[in-house]
Amino acid sequence: MSRKAFVKGANPYMPLWEHVPDGEPRVFTYNGETRVYVYGSHDTERTEYCGKDYVAWSAPVTDLTDWHCHGICYQAADGSILYAPDVVQKGDTWYMYAADCKGSRIMVARSETPWGPFTDPVQTELGFDPGVLVDDDGRVYAYWGFCKSYCAELNEDMATIKAGTLRENPIPHCRAQWSPDDGCEGRECFFEASSPRKIFGKYVYIYSRRVNHHVPELGVYEDCNGFLSYMWSDRPLDGWQWGGDISFNGGEILTDAEGMGTMTFRWGNNHGSVTEVNGQWYVFYHRQTGRDEYSRQAMLEPIDAAQGKDGKVWLGRIVYRDGKPIASCPVEMTSQGPQVNGINAREWISAGYACHLHGGKETAWIEPVYEQRDDISAPVKNITDGTAVGFRYLQFGLQTPKTVTLMMKADGAGKVSVRLDTPGGKEIAKFDVKDGETTVPVQGGIIGKHAVYFVFGMKNGTAEMDRFTFDD
């Protein structure tokens, strides 16, 4: 194996061995250093959602590829499984809203540092998936709910609800077999994952919506809660107006001539939020790996943020006319994440960074890994005839590479076609399917930033893709 660096800080932005879904990004300054902190669940149980601890991760605002784990920051006193948390700062204290006992008991714990440990938990009056906003005037608002949403102002104790402020169902909830039977059929469709923010002086309620109708342009033809959506208001507890969708974890959307879309990555539940870092806004969300929803991973993408003349907050991929926002849609799901110029094509790139897994006679998946090594790779397994494994995007620089090296395992025979920009794009290399590390020449000039796809033509059997790299 060539001795070269392994890609890190792409998408997922944490190491491939880490599994932190439901990430709430927060920008905090401590001892003069400003960092982005992410607080989420921790998929360590492997056979069910989440785990029995929270870990805190952070990165300097100057480099969102350089993430550091501060270790365990909270565990429930009774050792119960913890669902999605949130953390806010008020004064010199950081407050963690911890979802003990699978989210049925919301505790607030305190710390004198943003990375914890968070201690002395007190039970609150909040419910499932709590999100908290400390307003500019110091007043504190909380948002929560599963299927049905709630919000309220909190008392000074940061735990109890201020009398007369509780709002029930501020956002119409989705229809589902486990939800109340008064669910809406409109676009709002609240599901879970409440996350409040203040943007451009407006209140923004970010949440996971469960779509109960077809969205053909995104390849949605069944009930689907892979969206992070938002509403906005002039007030913190009511008056919510539809904003749009920020993120969708169904991968690249392939669109046919009739405008009908096809997802290329297995969607699943979604949870996250947005934050501004050095003038650029980002959405933090999660993806699914493995064959279930118990090994989710933290993802991020840069997004547009703007305000219309009517005061509306626009988030996501925004369409402008004459310099004014007129429409928006979810940002694309990528392999590059914070590496906005593309992943270095000359480093080892794990197959686990794929954002496109589509086609094939059977379903391929990214195999979860847990060993804490810098050179760990998460392979794509169960590759069959027609499977395309795609990466958006790689950076080739100003010089065309001479070779591409692929590491894989196989129990069958076939060919691998390496294609540029689309799964059916220009072929730049071709491999025989076989065990081990194989190097072949690159055909044609390649410079700059491109999507790269490995399209498998299997005569028989299956293959497993581990990693690849380009060389001069």
Located regions from the model:
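Carbohydrate-active catalytic/glycan-binding domains of CAZyme proteins
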Residues: M1-D472
